[in-house]
Regions:
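Alpha-helical support elements that line or immediately flank enzyme active sites
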Residues: 32-50, 292-309, 349-357
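A structural signal for small-residue-enriched, beta-sheet-centric alpha/beta enzyme cores
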Residues: 3, 7, 12, 26-30, ...
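Membrane-embedded translocation segments of transport machinery
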Residues: 253-261, 265, 274-308
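Conserved phosphate/anionic-ligand binding catalytic regions in large, soluble enzymes, centered on
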Residues: 23-41, 277-297, 339-343
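A structural-propensity feature for long, helix-poor, extended segments
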Residues: 56-104, 116-126, 312-360, 366, ...
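Flexible, glycine/charged-enriched surface loops at secondary-structure junctions
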Residues: 49-59, 102-107, 128-130, 216-222, ...
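Signature of multi-pass transmembrane helix bundles
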Residues: 122-277, 443-464, 474
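Acidic-glycine-rich active-site phosphate/pyrophosphate-binding loop
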Residues: 2-17, 54-68, 257-277, 310-328, ...
Length: 475
């Protein structure tokens, strides 16, 4: 039964830290959302008497790590009626919002803000560059025409505000938050010490942590499931390519209605809705909405179909979030490998195995199985194609988890990068992922060449007033 967490547990309080930092409501792709968040803080710092005029903006400078650059290149932004793309536009919208709300900063963007943001980008008032390092990094510098400046840095995670400055002097971000202009999810960098604790955990500890799920935390886990189910419903109505193709396969008798088909359809719908700019939030996991879909929907839909008790379903989803966070503590926030396969996927497949057989042996086998299947799936940036990747991951998640739960080790044990234990497998996978880090700059170069310098993109169909600027200003 679900109850209160045991107070003397070696992992006491750790799951609450994971929920606070990594399982958050998120509107749209989280990398542009984090850029908008930083930009909104920068604008909030410079608000004078509660007013902020875009006419007084001289320049918005955005610097991000290669992973953020990659994931912000081609994904559609929420609040743009399905037309806005690119990190420069996300930053411009965040500045105009001047109301930092974590990964939901772009909520409520109106037509006027869209038009003003498009003009800022088209008039080259927004600059974008990339760092060489692989660590998660976002910096937004805002310069006004009167010379006043602000600077915000986010490091170590999507809402982890590391530094806020006005005119090159530190400003306590907590003071801004307490005035009602921040978000409950922004935290100082020092609070990331929970990741050190996670790295020291065994999988036995992780399973025990999920088993101690409190009533309050179980409600939050269920809230995340409900949010992602709602998002999937919106995605079904949108009928984007990944969803339409799966439906056509059933119509043409290529696949049949089944639990497997339903899981793939629901994750495709939720993911394609996010990548398509739907103004409906997801509950994220590990700082990613798509990974939130991955960690919640396959285990939940499986459990409901198999009449697994509700408390075990929720504990299994808690385990999925925990394992995703555990993997992130080793791999980093933005790995070159697809997170839906190598971190959230590992959590989700372990959750399914846990529902069938809640033992360390079954969970370990699930980790080994999925690693043997799809550990090498590449992340080439957030886009419509993410829905297809999540479908492939969901298919493997179900197979790997069921096989493990029913006692079948698909890898045959330690082979390739699969280790003898779950911990060893994760460490082996981490070695491979660290070796892949030079790929991100190369992928970004390919994206630029493939899409005609997509990082400068703004609107697929710009507002008329923004179009009028194109004859005067170079884009």
């Amino acid at each position: 039964m679900i109850g209160e967490t045991v107070s003397d547990s070696p992992t006491s309080g750790l799951f609450k830290s994971i929920l606070k930092h990594e399982v958050q409501k998120a509107l749209g792709c989280t990398e542009p959302g984090a850029v908008a968040f930083a930009a909104a803080i920068a604008a909030q710092v410079l608000k004078d008497g509660g007013k902020f005029s875009p006419d007084n903006i001289e320049k918005v400078w955005v610097t991000v790590c290669p992973g953020v650059m990659k994931n912000g290149a081609a994904v559609t932004l929420p609040g743009t009626e399905g037309q806005g793309i690119g990190l420069p536009l996300a930053a411009a919208l965040g500045v105009l919002a001047a109301n930092p709300d974590g990964l939901n900063t772009l909520q409520g963007v109106d037509a006027k803000a869209r038009e003003q943001a498009a003009c800022l980008v088209c008039q080259n008032h927004v600059g974008l560059s990339s760092t060489e390092g692989s660590e998660f990094f976002i910096e937004v510098k805002l310069e006004m025409k009167n010379g006043v400046t602000s600077e915000v840095q986010i490091t170590g995670g999507h809402t982890h505000v590391a530094s806020v400055k006005k005119n090159e002097k530190d400003v306590p971000w907590n003071s801004i938050s307490e005035n009602g202009n921040g978000t409950s999810t922004d935290v100082p960098l020092s609070d990331l010490s929970y990741r050190e604790r996670l790295r020291k955990c065994s999988f036995e500890d992780l399973i025990a942590m999920a088993g101690e799920l409190s009533i309050k935390d179980a409600r939050y886990v269920k809230l995340g499931v409900d949010m992602n189910l709602r998002l999937a419903k919106v995605g079904l109505e949108m009928g984007r390519p990944a969803v339409a193709s799966l439906q056509k396969m059933v119509i043409h008798n290529v696949s049949a209605p089944s639990l497997e088909t339903n899981i793939k359809l629901m994750v495709a719908a939720a993911t394609s809705a996010r990548m398509g700019g739907a103004d409906v939030p997801a509950m994220s996991s590990g700082g990613s909405g798509n990974q939130g879909v991955d960690t919640t929907l396959p285990p939940y839909l499986f459990g409901k179909d198999k009449n697994i008790p509700e408390d075990r379903i929720l504990k299994s989803i808690a385990l999925a979030h925990i394992i995703n966070a555990y993997c992130k503590a080793f791999f980093g926030d933005l790995a070159p490998a697809c997170g839906c396969a190598v971190s959230a996927g590992l959590g989700a497949t372990a959750a399914i195995a846990y529902q069938i057989n809640p033992t360390l042996e079954a969970v370990t086998c699930a980790i080994q199985n999925l690693t043997a299947m799809i550990a090498g799936m590449l992340c080439d940036g957030a886009s419509e194609g993410c829905a297809a990747k999540v479908v492939v991951a969901a298919d493997a998640i179900l197979w790997a988890g069921c096989a493990a739960g029913y006692g079948d080790n698909l890898s045959g044990g330690a082979a390739g990068i699969v280790g003898k234990t779950a911990e060893e497998t994760i460490k082996n996978l981490n070695r491979v992922i660290q070796g892949m880090l030079p790929l991100d700059p190369e992928i970004n170069d390919v994206i630029r060449m493939n899409a005609g310098n997509v990082h400068r993109a703004c609107f697929k169909r710009p507002p008329l007033s923004a179009m009028a600027q194109l004859s005067t200003f170079e884009v």
